[in-house]
Structures are given as C-alpha cells and as structure tokens.
Amino acid sequence: MLKNTGHEEISLSSLSSSDYSQLEELVNFLIDNFKDKGVNISLPSLRIDAFSLDVMGKVQDIKKSSLTFAPEAGSQRLRDVINKGLTKEVILEGAGMAFEGGWNKVKLYFMLGLPTETEEDMKAIPELANEIAALYYDTVPKEQRNGKCQITISTSFFVPKPFTPFQWATMLDPSDYLARAKIVNDHVKEQLNHKSCLLYTSPSPRD
C-alpha cells in the first residue's frame, strides 16, 4: 500500500497505543520492514507513564519527528477528577525520557470545559508546558541538543459521551469555550522566554 500511495509515514493512532502489550514488538517489525525505505513511524497521543524509552529511541533512529502526550488536564486536581492517574512528577519524568531519547519537539493534548474546571486549571496548562520546556534545557547538555525546544499545546473541547462517568455533565456554549481558550492563550504568552518556544493551537468549538 505504501508503494502504491507514496505515503511516508505509518501512524499508530489508537488513543491507547502505549497500552498495547506488543507495542515494542510491533515497532520493531515496522522498523525492520520500512527503515530502509525512509518511512516514518508515528506514535501519537501516548500515555507518558507507559511510554518506553527503548521504543522512543528506535523510532527516533528512523526520522526525527514530534511526540504527542495527553495529560488532558493541566492541574493535578483536575487530572484526579477525571481519573487520569498521572502526577506532574510522572509527566516530567516521561518528558525527560523523551528529551534524553533525542526529541526536542513535544505536543501536549488537553481538554477544556471538563467538569469542575476553574481558571486556575486552565492557567495550569501553559504552566505545565513551560515546566516541560525548561526541563529540556536542564536535562540535555548544550552540545547534545537537537536545536531549540518546541512545545505545542493543543486543546479540544469537552463533549459529554454516553456510558461514561460524565455523560450527564453540561456541555458549555461555544462562547464559553472560546473564553477558556483565550485564557489559555493569554497565559501561554506570559510563559514565553528566550529559551523555550510554546505554541498554542485550539480548534473552533464548532469543529
């Protein structure tokens, strides 16, 4: 299929790719078969605590790209509310592993409008991203850095889904979502410094 389409990337796009017990074996198989063809292996939306440095290193050997992690909430309080099961320490440890593996571009996925979300929770998103950016310079020696660190913050808007703990939660109006995205964007600008590069991308609430 790759030969016929000309595609240059194979993406394991499941939301729980890192929970797959045979992930390392699958990555090894893909690398063995496509490394010489210059085909990139993409592992999006990974759980930081379940990500293997060994797997990262093998993927990095093919082609440098960005990694996507999904903390989903910026504050520990809100991560506990949604039962994410991630502490800031684990997030920073996972990001440090990625930087040690040769990455300098990381995409962080969050949700806005989660039940009980406050302005402090929103501001915690760019603050966490900035801590991760600072970690890059603390973790990787200057002579080993692969360019400037780039952290991309991506948010989507919470939509209640049936048969989930928050199925009866209220969905916000589009104007409320835009107001929350503005809070995040404004606070991102306050985090910028000469070393790190924080980018923020937010979809339209009508997407």
Regions found by a protein language model. Give the residues of each.
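Conserved SAM/AdoMet-binding glycine-rich loop
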Residues: 2-152
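Short, active-site-adjacent cap segments at secondary-structure transitions
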Residues: 19, 160-161
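Long, polar/charge-rich, low-hydrophobicity segments
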Residues: 130, 134-144, 167-178, 182-183
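A structural signal for short, well-ordered beta-strand segments and their strand-loop junctions
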Residues: 152-154, 198-199
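Contiguous mid-protein beta-loop-alpha structural module that forms a pocket-lining wall or clamp
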Residues: 157
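Conserved small/polar residues in nucleotide/adenosyl-binding loops
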Residues: 200-207
